[in-house]
Amino acid sequence: MADNAQVVPVEEPAATATATATATATTEPEAKSSDQMESQSDNKPPMGTLMALVNILAAGVLPIFTFVLSLTLLGYAVWLLYMRSYDCEDILGLPRVQTLASVGLLAVFVVSNAALFLRRKFPMPALVVMVVVLLLMLFIGLAYAGVNEMQSRRFPATRMWFKLKIMDDHVTWNNIKSCVYDKGACNDLIYGSPNEKPYNRRKMPPIKNGCCMPPETCNMDAINATFWYRRKDEGPPSSMNLMYGDEMMVGRISDCQLWRNDWSILCYDCRSCKFGFIRSVRRKWWQLGIFLIVISILLLMSHLLIFLATFWERFKG
C-alpha cells in the first residue's frame, strides 16, 4: 500500500493569485500618486525662500529705492534756493514763499529718511507720520497745479491767488507795472524792432506779447513793433477772446482803447499785460505743484510697501 501511494502536487488556488495581482496593481497607482505629490511639493518654494525674498525687500530694495526717491526732494529744494526770482516777483512776496517751499522740501527729506531709519523699532508711528506729511504735500501740490481752485486761493503763487492779487488789486498792479517798465521789458522791441511782419507772437515771452503790443483781435496795423494804428474802415471788435497758453480768458474792449503809441504807456494797463505777467511768474509754481503731486504719491506707495514688508517679516519671524 505504501509503495503504491502517489504524491499529488498541491496547486495554489486561483483566488490567491488573483488577490496578489490585484494588490500589486493597487499599490502601483498609490506609489505613482505619492511620487507626484512629492514632485509637486518639491516645485513649491519653501517658506525659507519666501522669507528671504521679504527680507531682501524690507532690508535692501525698498529702503534704497525710497532713499534715492527722497534725493529728488533735496535736489529740488536746492534748485529753488538758488533759482533766480523773476523780475518784480518781490512785490508779491514770492521770494519768501520760494524759500519756505525749499525749507519744507528739506524737512520732508529729513522726515522720510528718519522714518526709514526707525522703521524696525517704530513701524506704525513712522508710517502714520509719513502718511500725514505726504498727504499734506499732495494737497499743496494740487493747489499749486490748479486742480483745487476753491482752496488754491489760500496759498500764495497759485492761479486764484494771482487773480486776486493782480487782476483785482489795482494798487499792486500799479507797482508791478512800474517795475516792469523800469526793468525795460519792451526796450529790445523799442530800440530794435524786427522788420518782418506780421510778428510771430508765439515766440515772444508772454510779458512782451501782452504789454508791448496791442492784442491781435484789435485789428491794428503795425509800422514797427511798438507803433500801431487802427484801420479806419474797421472799428474795435464787440468782444474778443484772448488765448494765453492754457487759459481762455474773455478780454475787454478797453484793451484796444487803452493802447497808446507812447513808449511809457503802450499796453501796460491792458488785461493782456496782466495775463502775460501771470504766465511768466506762474509757470515755476505750476511745475512745483506737478512735482509735489508725483513725488508724494511715489513716496506714499514706497513707505506703505516698506511697512507691509516689515510687518510680514516680524509676523513670520
Swiss-Prot record:
Topological domains (Cytoplasmic): residue ranges? 1-60, 118-126, 309-317
List the keywords (alphabetical).
Answer: Glycoprotein, Membrane, Transmembrane, Transmembrane helix
How does this protein sit in the membrane?
A: Multi-pass membrane protein
Q: Where is the composition biased (Low complexity)?
A: 7-28
Q: What is its main location?
A: membrane
Topological domains annotated Extracellular: 82-96, 148-287
Give the transmembrane region(s): 61-81, 97-117, 127-147, 288-308
InterPro entries in the cross-refs = TET_plant (IPR044991), Tetraspanin/Peripherin (IPR018499)
Give a Pfam family name.
Answer: Tetraspanin
Share an example GO biological-process annotation for this protein: auxin-activated signaling pathway
- Stretch list, region Disordered: 1-43
- Carbohydrate-modified residues are 224
Can you supply one Gene Ontology CC term for this chain's record? membrane
Q: Where found?
A: Membrane
**Which family is it part of?**
Belongs to the tetraspanin (TM4SF) family.
Tell me, what does this protein do in biology? May be involved in the regulation of cell differentiation.
Protein name in the entry: Tetraspanin-15
Underlying gene: TET15
